[in-house]
Amino acid sequence: MNAKLSSSGMVLKELPEVALQKISSNYYWAVFAVFLLCAIVFPLVSIFSLPQKQTYHRFFSILSLVSCLAYFTMACNYGLKNVFSSASFFREVSVRMVYYVRYIQWLINFPLIIVMLHWTVGVSILEIAYVVCYVLFAIVCLLAAALTSSPYKWAYYGFSFVGYFIALAHSVVLHKKYASRLETSARLGFLWSIVYLHVIWFLYYACWILSEGLNVISPIGEAIFYSILDLFEFGFFGAAFSWMLDLVGIENFKSPQSIPLGACSPADDKFSMCPDMEAQNQADDLAVETRIQISNLPSSPTKNNC
């Protein structure tokens, strides 16, 4: 009997504290309400917005709806798994609740944001897919790290950070390739969006170290940290990006792909190198000179028909 009680006591000692789990659940309900409001507001705004901006509001409504579903699941204490932690800094609790539904939310939302941002400046589909693949790779590796109880979790964490860094580097390259042809205000707006996205994303890695990684912060601390990042990344960012489009002017985000094949971009002036345009101009000049020469030729005498 005593052995059973001692064994059950050991199990209870290893499980997360019920009080903290209840507090974090209540907090998840509050964040769920915020995302639910965003999921309702963005579609309504898209109805009364310009046709050019309706697509963006639909993107933001999808982000809010996915986040709303994820936080509803976490508030109901579903979509989680208890994982033994090799490092315990919080009240000697060596079992950590890992909400894998949170990573499913990121697997959907982060690629959507990447597609929306790069589609705005006319990045090609293949280059967008290249960035999205590294984003998915980073999130899957981070999920594998969270579900791993051995020190090998840090290897998965390193792989995830490498994927994040490659996605960041490629976004910078795409900014120089595509956004450099835009007007100054549009170029700065796109750069601000990329910096905002990746700075918040970097904070996710810091939060992961403190929660799933080293088990430093409590479940309620993890809930607050992650929810603030989610609100800024998937909620506030939509309103800020929409305001930026109104401030800069969506017409200033000219897509390089909308330029006919063989033509130069509007940013190319007459002193820039544009072989196709130069060849077309030379052909037009040659045609004009030919018509002038033909018109200056003496007319041949006509024969009188008797």
Swiss-Prot record:
GO CC list: plasma membrane
* Record GO biological process: meiotic cell cycle
CDD domains in the record = 7tm_YRO2_fungal-like (cd15239)
Q: Which SUPFAM superfamilies match?
A: Family A G protein-coupled receptor-like
Q: Topology relative to the membrane, per the entry?
A: Multi-pass membrane protein
Q: Quote the subcellular location field of this record.
A: Membrane
Report keywords, A-Z.
Answer: Meiosis, Membrane, Transmembrane, Transmembrane helix
Spans through the membrane: 28-48, 59-79, 103-123, 125-145, 154-174, 190-210, 224-244
Give the chief site where it resides: membrane
PANTHER family to which the protein is assigned, alphabetical: 30 KDA HEAT SHOCK PROTEIN-RELATED, PTHR28286
State what this protein does.
Has a role in meiosis.
Family listed: Belongs to the archaeal/bacterial/fungal opsin family.
Q: What is this protein called?
A: Meiotically up-regulated gene 73 protein
The gene name on file is mug73
